[in-house]
Curated annotation (Swiss-Prot):
Record's protein name: Glutathione peroxidase 1
Family per similarity comment: Belongs to the glutathione peroxidase family.
InterPro entries xrefs: Glutathione_peroxidase, GPX_AS, GPX_CS, Thioredoxin-like_sf
Active site: U47
Length: 201
């Protein structure tokens, strides 16, 4: 069993994990976000839904951040090589290419990582174990098996860019959404979690 899966198996919440910010610096412990509702997405700057999803992530962070939502984006190049820029190039790609027009994410972006396979970030190994399939499309699979560029392949793998994981204020994953489910449409589920108030976990 790889280290990522061992870490995922031992974890009880996302608070066991950390990730390095895209801008550099020390890793951010997700434990520092205790009591917040988290929306975690694997992102890519050259995907067909980049403009839609990035702008909707910004909108949710703008509207619901003051009430306790934290949006987290994890660039990943495992799906159609649609995040092939280096870490230091991603923000400029977003600003000038897609979405473009001076776009700047107002949410936390982390360094590129893998979300599937033996090299998967431990956070994503945990999320996939906790929520094996998207709630809106339990049969979601990668549409073209020739594009699978990781091993081992598991039934609970992330199928494409912009899958979403909603995590409650106790750090426990609540719901997973497919790439087809628009980010902005998660708002009612986020509102429901925010209305529960912060957890003491």
């Amino acid at each position: 069993m790889c280290a990522a899966r061992l870490a995922a198996a031992a974890a009880q919440s996302v608070y066991a994990f950390s990730a390095r910010p895209l801008a550099g610096g020390e890793p951010v412990s997700l434990g520092s976000l205790r009591g917040k509702v988290l929306l975690i997405e694997n992102v890519a700057s050259l995907u067909g839904t980049t403009v839609r999803d990035y702008t909707q992530m910004n909108e949710l962070q703008r509207r619901l951040g003051p009430r306790g939502l934290v949006v987290l984006g994890f660039p990943c190049n495992q799906f159609g090589h649609q995040e092939n820029a280096k870490n230091e190039e991603i923000l400029n790609s977003l600003k000038y290419v897609r979405p473009g027009g001076g776009f700047e994410p107002n949410f936390m972006l982390f360094e590129k990582c893998e979300v599937n396979g033996a090299g998967a970030h431990p956070l994503f190994a945990f999320l996939r174990e906790a929520l094996p399939a998207p709630s809106d499309d339990a049969t979601a699979l990668m549409t073209d098996p020739k594009l699978i560029a990781w091993s081992p392949v598991c039934r609970n793998d992330v199928a494409w860019n912009f899958e979403k994981f909603l995590v409650g204020p106790d750090g426990v994953p609540v719901r997973r959404y497919s790439r087809r489910f628009q980010t902005i449409d998660i708002e009612p589920d986020i509102e429901a979690l925010l209305s529960q108030g912060p957890s003491s976990a």
